[in-house]
């Protein structure tokens, strides 16, 4: 049953944007698992982030040109921005590897990137069923659960760093990498919360 007014272009653009989240996160996970050809592969993440920025801009442009929207104008803006934020931090994590010359990232970083992949996939599934107000909340709940897991992984990884890393410069680099990755999972949770609010307003 469709509870939201029909405007396929908005939903198409949101689907495109959420797909870029998954693509960027998968690229980052691959880099962290096997960090060869760093420069080229980080540029690939950057290219996906640029495509997402263009899609976000297209959503905002359409919003400004539309008299009737499928849900609150503010929520359209918030959803676009929050989805884009996830990829911004995914891209930032990738760039930390080049900036800090991290050639052997700690294993927990790939674990965190894997959680971002899972969150991005859940967000994409939630966006895909948003038009018909389908099982969006189930996907939002899973994103939030994964964020709790990421918090635990990040805390454990940082604690381990202070126990085992003897080089203070490396410690600072790795700690910041963990924090940027964990922030990406926080941003995914923020996006899920926006999705949830849209559904609850439409119920």
Where do the protein language model's features map onto the residues?
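Cytosolic, long alpha-helical scaffolding segments
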Residues: 1-203
């Amino acid at each position: 049953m469709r509870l939201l007014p029909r405007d396929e272009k908005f939903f198409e653009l949101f689907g495109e944007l959420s797909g870029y989240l998954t693509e960027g996160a998968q690229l980052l996970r691959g880099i962290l698992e096997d960090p060869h050809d760093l420069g080229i592969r980080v540029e690939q993440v950057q290219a996906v982030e640029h495509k997402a920025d263009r899609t976000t801009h297209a959503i905002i442009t359409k919003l400004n040109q539309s008299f009737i929207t499928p849900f609150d104008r503010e929520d359209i803006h918030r959803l676009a921005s929050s989805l884009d934020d996830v990829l911004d931090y995914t891209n930032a994590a990738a760039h930390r590897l080049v900036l800090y010359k991290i050639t052997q990232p700690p294993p927990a970083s790939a674990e965190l990137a894997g959680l971002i992949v899972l969150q991005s996939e859940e967000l994409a599934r939630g966006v895909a069923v948003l038009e018909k107000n389908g099982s969006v909340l189930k996907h939002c709940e899973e994103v939030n659960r994964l964020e709790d897991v990421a918090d635990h992984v990040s805390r454990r990884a940082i604690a381990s760093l202070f126990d085992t890393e003897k080089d203070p410069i490396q410690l600072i680099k790795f700690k910041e990498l963990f924090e940027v990755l964990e922030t990406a999972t926080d941003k995914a949770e923020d996006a899920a919360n926006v999705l949830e609010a849209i559904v609850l307003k439409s119920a």
